[in-house]
């Protein structure tokens, strides 16, 4: 082991002293540690003499706090006093003094031998003269001062509330203005806010400005409670657009006197109920815009009524346009505008009642004016190139597919609002007249039955209805009469089942006569179909009988059928006016009243049928014609 070289081990002791300063050369200056007496004095100064003996938890918490304080601040620098126990002595002396004073006070209160405590008695002051008056004056001054303070406070509170309400109204006005801008076009002109009610942006050419003004609602009293329907925003609408308006379209049979024109019975249409939550200005603006649109439509119709050249001129008087689509029939278009004043409401309330107003045509007028606006916008010509191909103009325009003058003029013809609405009115009137004619025949004539099936898909100028003529209980075998009526503007096209087309005019009598003749033919056709089912043979059939009574409406139809064995024959004649006449032919052997002659000697001539005998059709039992005919055929058919 002696041969191993020694190893130097450096041992550094732990820093037991607090470093006070580190020099620039790296030297450290340490704080001298406290002596035992100084450490004891430091601990004695930390004693809290106001602490009770039972507070051990608080003492432990205080010791923990001291430990944390020592860790944060480091070693407390002790400032030695003249005597280490000086603070302890001072605390003990003050405590002893307090205890002695407390002991003396308790002895004095408990034992009366040391001191007796009596209440101090004061002599009553002599009453001063007018003491009550002074008291009242002082109370009055006090109440006046208090009232003045309360009044000043109330005034300040009212000013604060008014300012808050004004700020709230200003905020509500801005929010309502924002809602208004979302629905209507607004612009600011100076210190005014103006809106636009017209349809110029949609293509309208009506010269009315249609401007309304947005104002702030200041009619409310700030001292009173704000109503529930209060709106901080209000609109000022021109006087000629106030109230409600509509276009009354009616069809009348008799034309009034010329002195009664322009005095149409106007009834005030109630405004539509606003949706819950809709502001009142929205309802007013919509009503004003509707008034403006109605005035534009009526102005356009009046202009066209004056310009159009027709066989029967149109009449424009005041707020009414009268046209004559059919002879003895007039179409009246009136502008009904009622303001919101009380006088007009009273006068119009007496005239309200059932009117012959055609709401369909009013709706169509609004649609037509919107289509006119759309065409106005679509007719805007886009910029064209400034150059063109060289050559003569006649060579450029001519060609094999060039249009002549008539074709160009026909292509440039456009129907106006008045012409379109007159055509629609004609179609509506013709459709109503057709329905009324069919219903009257169905209610008046029970046999055969007539049924009408109206199509749900129609056009404004054309409608269709399918007419079936049947017999009750025999719908499967008696369905040969099926008519398709195409109702147009001036005429009715009838399409038969076999494809034949008949054109009828607008006259009601023509349609009625045609349906009566078809119902008459149905009875004969029903006998033909029944004969096939019963096994009878058809000898003759015609829809136009040339013999017998001449019918004023249509022609009579007839059919003759024989029994399966040929013994009996039935002849049926049916006319629209003369009615039904049924004849039966019996064999000669069953005719006893035949005169005997020498001409027919052989027995074979006895098998010929004798003369016809008319059947008393009214006394036959059965619910309809076909049922009676079935019973008759069954009775004449051999077993």
From Swiss-Prot:
InterPro entries: Mediator_Med17. Keywords: Activator, Nucleus, Transcription, Transcription regulation. It is found in: Nucleus. The keyword Nucleus applies. Its main location: nucleus. GO terms for molecular function: transcription coregulator activity. The keyword Nucleus applies. One of its GO terms (biological process) is regulation of transcription by RNA polymerase II. Pfam families: Med17 (PF10156). GO terms for cellular component: mediator complex. Belongs to the Mediator complex subunit 17 family. Component of the Mediator complex, a coactivator involved in the regulated transcription of nearly all RNA polymerase II-dependent genes. Mediator functions as a bridge to convey information from gene-specific regulatory proteins to the basal RNA polymerase II transcription machinery. Mediator is recruited to promoters by direct interactions with regulatory proteins and serves as a scaffold for the assembly of a functional preinitiation complex with RNA polymerase II and the general transcription factors. Component of the Mediator complex. This is Mediator of RNA polymerase II transcription subunit 17. It comes from Xenopus tropicalis (Western clawed frog).
